[in-house]
UniProtKB/Swiss-Prot annotation:
SUPFAM superfamilies: Tetrahydrobiopterin biosynthesis enzymes-like. Keywords: Cytoplasm, NADP, Oxidoreductase, Queuosine biosynthesis. Homodimer. GO terms for biological process: queuosine biosynthetic process; tRNA modification. GO terms for molecular function: preQ1 synthase activity. It comes from Psychrobacter arcticus (strain DSM 17307 / VKM B-2377 / 273-4). Belongs to the GTP cyclohydrolase I family. QueF type 2 subfamily. It comes from the Bacteria. This is NADPH-dependent 7-cyano-7-deazaguanine reductase. GO terms for cellular component: cytoplasm. The gene is queF.
Length: 285
């Protein structure tokens, strides 16, 4: 079945019994082959999924609710299609469990089987004051006003354009390299299944001998606005483009996508696993 098949249809049957078969895997190679870069360098990182509508029954038949976070390693052969995950989570709404640990174990097993890699699952009580659930702020400076003094209108593009990174840039370099940390709230792309817009905040920490031109970086981010790509593929495209242009010694790219169907997706790619940040949640989530 194509990813544009049943999952993309407007009318969907929502299962009321536990249905792990609803989970729909999508090969990461679909997006990585389009990028056409070194796939192994895109395999360092995690996709954090946060689910806010998780519910099941205890043995008294009383509904239980929790917030869940799933960590899918970037080296998994597959991702899970987001609507299929929503259907799967809905399917356990009326399933009885003896403990929270049973729920956690079942979800971890099913997701791991779907993506063919070990998925980390955390469940949080609504009363938890867990720091990872509090509203955070991206590190670095916001570049969303970098073009405020520009007299040139930013054009809409059908595809991301990495050549914008070098537009009007000088060849000046920093001999020892410098770390630039910045973010933008303006990343937008389209879901390739439904064509609905996906909005995200994007954060980058990059150590490079090349100076980061904020105006060019913002133009580049805006070039994604009409691009059809899954969340993970968009972040990997950005990681690949920045790697090739800036030749950084260190690079971290992460995005916090806004929630849809009670689920938000937060991919992160790093040049070294030691650079992996902790999962967090932003104000639009």
């Amino acid at each position: 079945m194509s990813i544009h098949g049943i999952l993309g249809e407007q009318t969907t049957d929502y299962p009321t019994e536990y249905s792990p078969e609803t989970l729909y895997p999508i090969a990461r190679s679909m997006g990585r082959d389009v990028i056409g870069w070194q796939n192994d360098k895109l395999e360092v990182g995690v996709d954090w999924w946060q689910a806010f509508e998780l519910s099941w029954l205890n043995q008294q038949g009383i509904s239980q609710v929790a917030i869940a976070r799933f960590g899918i390693p970037a080296n998994s052969p597959f991702i899970v299609e987001s609507k299929s995950l929503k259907l799967y989570l809905n399917s356990i709404n009326f399933t009885e469990f003896g403990s929270w640990a049973e729920v956690q174990k079942l979800i971890a097993e099913d997701l791991s089987k779907c993506v063919q890699a070990e998925v980390q699952v955390e469940l949080f009580h609504l009363a938890d004051r867990h720091s990872g659930l509090l509203i955070a702020q991206p590190d670095g400076i916001c570049i969303d006003d970098a073009l405020v003094n520009s007299t040139e209108k930013v054009a809409l593009m059908l595809h991301p354009d990495a050549s914008l990174l070098e537009r009007d840039s000088s060849d000046a370099q920093i001999s020892d390299g410098k770390t630039f940390s910045f973010y933008s709230n303006l990343l937008r792309s389209n879901c390739p299944v439904t064509n609905q817009p996906d909005w995200a905040a994007l954060a980058v920490s990059i150590t490079s001998k090349k100076v980061v031109n904020q105006a060019n970086m913002l133009r580049y981010i805006l070039s994604f606005r009409q691009h059809n790509g899954f969340h993970e593929q968009c972040v990997e495209q950005i990681f690949a483009d920045l790697s090739q242009y800036y030749e950084p010694s260190k690079l971290m790219v992460r995005a916090w996508y806004t929630r849809r169907g009670g689920i938000d997706i937060n991919p992160c790619r790093v040049s070294d696993i030691a650079l992996l940040p902790v999962p967090s949640r932003l104000i639009r989530q």
